[in-house]
Swiss-Prot record:
GO function terms (MF aspect): DNA binding; structural constituent of chromatin
Originating gene: ihfA
Assembly description: Heterodimer of an alpha and a beta chain.
This protein's UniProt keywords: DNA recombination, DNA-binding, Transcription, Transcription regulation, Translation regulation
InterPro entries, per the entry: Hist_DNA-bd (IPR000119), Histone-like_DNA-bd_CS (IPR020816), IHF-like_DNA-bd_dom_sf (IPR010992), IHF_alpha (IPR005684)
Name used for this protein in its record: Integration host factor subunit alpha
A Pfam short name: Bac_DNA_binding
Family, per entry: Belongs to the bacterial histone-like protein family.
Domain of life: Bacteria
Amino acid sequence: MSTLTKSDMIEHLMSHLNLTRQEGRCLVENFFDELSESLIDGKEVKLSGFGNFELKDKNSRPGRNPKTGEPVAVSARRVVTFKTGQKFRQQVDERLFDQ
């Protein structure tokens, strides 16, 4: 299994949309900036046909230091989760079973 990077996305935009490297980089960076800013501002991000980025609040809880085994308190925090859309999930499942 390989990894898709921002550079790969830029290369794809360059070849498929005939963009310059600078235009492709600007498009990719602006997309991720907008996504990040929306989440930082407390908004959910819904990408139709792909999935949703949601904010979840985690309560504080007891935990352990893995090195020492000593009990520690894990503070409350907000985390970003991603839930795949049904259409995208089906496409991934179909691709896995076709291989």
